UniProtKB/Swiss-Prot annotation:
This is F41 fimbrial protein. One of its GO terms (biological process) is cell adhesion. The lineage of its organism: Bacteria, Pseudomonadati, Pseudomonadota, Gammaproteobacteria, Enterobacterales. Fimbriae (also called pili), polar filaments radiating from the surface of the bacterium to a length of 0.5-1.5 micrometers and numbering 100-300 per cell, enable bacteria to colonize the epithelium of specific host organs. Residues 1-22 form the signal peptide. It comes from Escherichia coli. Pfam families: Fimbrial_K88. GO terms for cellular component: pilus. Belongs to the fimbrial K88 protein family.
Length: 277
């Protein structure tokens, strides 16, 4: 959405009294009185972080069986994390704050997540030889993921809370990152993005003084429908976050399209594109 400044000019006659700012005195006709200002979108932005620990695996050709190589991941490794720079008070929709994620392999081919549960997905990434850029095959990457939301509804002490979230359907938050229509686990989000329930609550509590977001809420908030009040209500404050990664003990599976001998370096880059609406 394009951010636009809007000005309004009005021609009028007026009587001036009291202490005011005024132009110089003129003879005859007083001329135009300019009334104007600006309208801007909130300064809230999405912040993103990508993992750096998935690029130093070391294996031998002896581990390849029928052109398949299993690659063990010994420690938790971040894949992608996201959080808002601040909470937003008022209507959420219409502020270019709804992120849709598209992933692609090195050649631009689309990576479509295969969701295996409400907290897990696999992605198939093309692999190439770093030396001559020839394709080597595909790499299956298992990811755990979660998303979280903190919301204060004005005057509502029941549902004002830090909660699990349902999203991911077309046009809604986290499209391409969560299983559409299935609630996610906020605790998995915190594992990967480093936030806490208290921090989530703090972002909205400072926008709604005197009101609080419960951190013991066990339910979920519905962000899977753009007509829902979570998107349209002006009487609330919201803050969202996301996280995904490869859990310790997981296995990446490389399916090679050719035999490999000697030494080579491989790479399976994932290009992340965020589209805001």
């Amino acid at each position: 959405m394009k951010k636009t400044l809007i000005a309004l000019a009005v021609a009028a006659s007026a009587a001036v009294s009291g202490s005011v700012m005024a132009a110089d005195w003129t003879e005859g006709q007083p001329g135009d009185i300019i009334i104007g200002g600006e309208i801007t979108s909130p300064s809230v932005k999405w912040l993103w972080k990508t993992g750096e620990g998935l690029s130093s695996f070391s294996n031998t050709t002896n581990e390849i069986v029928k052109r398949k190589l299993n690659i063990s991941v010994p420690t938790d490794e971040l894949f992608l994390a996201a959080k808002m720079s601040d909470g937003i008070k008022g209507v959420f929709v219409g502020n270019t704050l709804i992120p849709k994620i598209e992933m692609a392999s090195y050649d631009g081919s689309v990576i479509t997540p295969s969701f295996t549960s409400n907290t897990a997905m696999d992605i198939a990434v093309k692999v190439k030889n770093s030396g001559d850029n020839t394709e080597l095959g595909t790499l299956s990457v298992p990811l755990s993921f979660g998303a979280a939301v903190a919301t204060i509804f004005d005057g509502d002490t029941t549902d004002s809370a830090v909660a699990h979230i349902i999203g991911g359907s077309a046009g809604t938050v986290f499209e391409g990152l969560v299983n559409p229509g299935r609630f996610t686990d906020q605790n998995i989000a915190y594992k990967w993005n480093g936030l806490s329930k208290a921090e989530m609550a703090g972002y909205v509590e400072k926008l709604m003084p005197g009101q609080s977001a419960s951190t013991s809420y066990s339910g979920f908030h519905n962000w899977d429908d753009l007509s829902h009040s979570n998107y349209t209500s002006a009487n609330k404050a919201s803050y969202l976050s996301y996280g995904s990664g490869v859990s310790a003990g997981s296995t990446l599976v490389m399916n090679l399209n050719k035999d490999v001998a000697g030494r080579l370096e491989w790479v399976a880059p994932v290009t992340i594109t965020v589209i805001y609406s």
